[in-house]
Amino acid sequence: MEVREVPLPATTKLAADYITGAFPAEKGFGYARTDDEAFRRRLIHLQTRTYDRHGLADYLQAYHRRFSASAATMNNIDKLRDENSVVIVGGQQAGLLTGPLYTIYKIITIIRLAKEQEQKLGVPVVPLFWIAGEDHDIAEVDHVYVVEDGEVKKVVYPHKLKEKQMAADVPLDRQLADAWIERVVKTYGETDVTNELLSFLAACLDDSHTFVDFFAAIVLRLFADDGLVVLNAGDASVRPLERRFFAALIDRHRDVTSAVLAQQEALRALGYAPLIEIAPNAANLFYYDGRERSLLHYDEESGLFRNKTGSVALTKQQLLELAEAKPACLSNNVVTRPLMQEYLLPTLAFIAGPGEIAYWAELKEVFALFGMEMPPVVPRLQATLVSRSLQTDLVDIGLEAADVLSGRLEAVKQQWLKATAEAPLTEAFAKAKADIEAAHRPLRELGVAIDRGLEGLVAKNAAIIQAQIEFLQQTLERALLSKHEVEWRKFWRVETSLRPNGAPQERVWNVFYYVNRYGFDFVEKLSAISNPGNGMHKIVYI
């Protein structure tokens, strides 16, 4: 496995500037990405904070027993009881089969940084993945993309949801899930690994009742030897650990919103467009009754916290009582989730994708509201996988993988199409037919002059010659078409693999396509990539 690094700009301007150091870190973050002492200084800060470490470890141990988690994982959970222990954390929604590749890349970055900093700092550093199980946008996680019948297709798990349930509560039907997995894996093609892959996924389903269960079961098995720990943010059993901070968020809901809006204005002044959509009356919490998750806002006129439809209307006191007695009725939004993470976990660093980097910059002042400090934000591994056969295609069309990532493929393809469309066959054969007709005409006239009875013969001879030219033209056209089909398929394969539907590979394809092709140690090999969080895009030749 060969790795080449290229400086590919992030999808958002702020993230791109943060990664390169062009963004003034003090304007949006707690630490500069280039600060070599950031982790050591962050550790000193964490040692001044207190956490409910035993409550957290007790909860996590109970949760992980459901999945028969590895000894390495259970040992890492136990490390959290140590007052000196810290975590490297990153998170994502619970995509089926883990969703796009970037989720796996994020986990790899978490694990690698945890191992690295444990050696450097001499304290226990636990790799933890925050599963966004409280998210209710199931359409973002209910599918994977495959190549089927020569097209990129979205294969959706056939659930029927009428309400905005949390992903942690969305059930998986075993029969439907088995059929869905079989269809997906079938598109990958039969290999020596296929039966092992199907058995692996079936075993994961054995431990799963919901979307989040299935996600957790998969990643805990894939990264069992690395001791990965997961935290399901949609689990009702974690809410008692959060109740005190829910109360703080309710009590200071106006301040939270004001701090975000003020920071957004500060970023606009620097030339950066905010990503978080937040209304002046936002409460930044969701109410959840087990079926419907609805965002709350504060109605100044009535003094009530309401949802959009008005079916929920609570006084501040009622909401505080709910946080204490029934914390499972509350969940965080994009603003408060990072704060709750900071409250629960002694976070040494947060592993972020480009979008997260950009929106976390909008939260700097909110952390300060609660006496918190934003942890160092580290870019996740960004990578593009290139197979040997695909590299051959790239050579044939005269491009490097980096050219495709930087947007050159379309221009080269259009040049090829233009050259193909102007192939001179039609013009050449039209001229040849005219020239042959002009050359044959005097011969016909001479034959008829010698013997008028030869008129039919010379005419037939002319037709035979033209028919042979027509046959040659058709033969060359078929050969040209065949040649172009071969070339066209090269462009198609390159585009489909590296920029499917015009999107980055890591945002479309699923890791199990590659596992089916290269084996389960493929993930282990990816985990060995050097400097996964240095902000450089990795082109991985496999």
UniProtKB/Swiss-Prot annotation:
Name of the gene this protein is made from: bshC
Origin superkingdom: Bacteria
Organism classification: Bacteria, Bacillati, Bacillota, Bacilli, Bacillales
Disulfide pattern: none
Species per Swiss-Prot/TrEMBL record: Geobacillus thermodenitrificans (strain NG80-2)
UniProt name for this protein: Putative cysteine ligase BshC
Keyword check for Transcription regulation: no
Coiled-coil regions listed in the entry: 458-487
Keyword set includes Ligase: yes
Keyword entries, A-Z: Coiled coil, Ligase
Any one GO molecular function term: ligase activity
Enzyme Commission identifier(s): 6.-.-.-
Protein family (similarity comment): Belongs to the BshC family.
Annotated InterPro entries: Bacillithiol_biosynth_BshC, CC_BshC, Rossmann-like_BshC
Function: Involved in bacillithiol (BSH) biosynthesis. May catalyze the last step of the pathway, the addition of cysteine to glucosamine malate (GlcN-Mal) to generate BSH.
